[in-house]
């Protein structure tokens, strides 16, 4: 198998692998057995922390690579003065998806870390997985050049498609304490998802660009509170993997301290759950160095065109600064080897 991208472009060649039958994934519906590890937390609470999924030394090196990427962008904008212009476009939630950043070598190295991949293999009981080309989070505290990061509680799953369908994740790269911003989840909310959406079926929905996103209104938040659900800020150390059921209500907070927040969003699913059209679309995203949402089947693909004040960023990039070199295991995560010739 040719399982390594070239240094000039992302055109790929491969030997087609058979798409295996679906395995026995966790159900997260109260019927799962006890596992004696973090999976019990996931089943009960709708989220879990896998401590040290990435060894600390490597996590620190990835954080350094992320800083270097930002500093390289800053050098390209050396004649400007404001923070906004010295950085790539990063929204108030800390997310960056343009500039081909989602395919930088550090992003792929993090996605293909054994401890990260193995965690998702345990959930899906499957080694034939594909991974999302999702956003990178560069959350800097006290930025005055961005809008306020207001709470945006949501679930990343279409209410009309119930049940456990997707496990979201992020790999944390810097110390992340209770006041350092980051992921906040509604503990146990995943188990109430179907009941909630039955009761709120006629509520006017918050506008969204995809049906796979549902925002919770004040009435919805009150309902969750009355059901005894509590919101918990998830704290983590460098190298920890955070995972959550996409039905679990969640959002992210901005830091109240001087501590930045760096993380890489990582979501895996069995390749058996993706169609051949999905895989072809995913290959196109990989070859164009563009990102996807958290859905690994590339339901939606993005763009590398960052905008500033409505205009294309003059420092847009359309390929990674440091292109990834993927071994056979990582290349399978692109989904390309499973495309039928």
Functional labels for PLM-detected ranges:
Residues 122-130, 159-163, 172-180, 192:
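Secondary-structure boundary elements
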Residues 140-141, 186-194, 267-273:
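Short edge-strand/loop segments of extracellular domains
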Residues 14, 20-23, 201, 238-243, ...:
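Non-heme Fe(II)/2-oxoglutarate
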Residues 103-109, 155-157, 220-233, 251-254:
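Active-site rim elements
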Residues 47, 133, 164-170, 180-182, ...:
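Extracellular structured ligand-interaction cores
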Residues 166, 176-249:
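Double-stranded beta-helix
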């Amino acid at each position: 198998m040719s399982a390594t991208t070239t240094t000039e472009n992302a055109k790929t060649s491969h030997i087609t692998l058979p798409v295996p039958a679906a395995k026995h994934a966790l159900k997260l519906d109260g019927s799962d057995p006890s596992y004696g590890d973090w999976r019990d937390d996931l089943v009960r609470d709708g989220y879990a922390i896998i401590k040290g999924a990435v060894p600390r030394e490597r996590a620190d090196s990835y954080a350094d690579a992320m800083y270097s990427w930002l500093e390289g962008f800053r050098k390209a904008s050396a004649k400007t003065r404001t923070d906004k212009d010295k950085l790539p476009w990063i929204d108030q939630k800390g997310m960056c998806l343009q500039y081909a950043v989602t395919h930088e070598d550090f992003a792929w190295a993090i996605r293909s870390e054994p401890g990260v991949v193995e965690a998702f293999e345990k959930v899906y009981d499957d080694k034939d997985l594909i991974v999302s080309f999702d956003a990178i989070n560069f959350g800097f505290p006290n930025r005055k050049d961005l809008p306020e990061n207001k709470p945006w509680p949501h679930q990343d799953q279409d209410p009309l498609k119930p049940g456990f369908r997707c496990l979201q994740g992020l790999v944390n790269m810097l110390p992340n304490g209770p006041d350092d911003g980051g992921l906040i989840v509604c503990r146990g909310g995943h188990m109430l998802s179907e009941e909630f959406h039955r009761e709120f079926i006629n509520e006017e929905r918050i506008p969204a660009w995809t049906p796979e996103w549902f925002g919770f209104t004040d009435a919805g938040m009150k309902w969750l509170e009355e059901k005894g659900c509590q919101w918990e800020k998830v704290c983590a150390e460098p190298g920890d993997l955070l995972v959550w059921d996409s039905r679990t209500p969640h959002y992210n907070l901005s830091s109240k301290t001087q501590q930045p927040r760096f993380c890489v969003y990582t979501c895996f699913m069995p390749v058996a759950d993706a169609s051949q059209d999905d895989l072809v679309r995913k290959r196109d995203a990989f070859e164009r160095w563009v990102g996807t949402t958290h859905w690994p089947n590339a339901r939606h693909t993005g763009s590398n065109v960052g905008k500033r004040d409505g205009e294309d960023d003059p420092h847009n990039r359309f390929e990674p600064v440091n292109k990834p070199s993927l071994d056979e295991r990582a290349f399978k995560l692109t989904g390309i080897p499973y495309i039928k010739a």
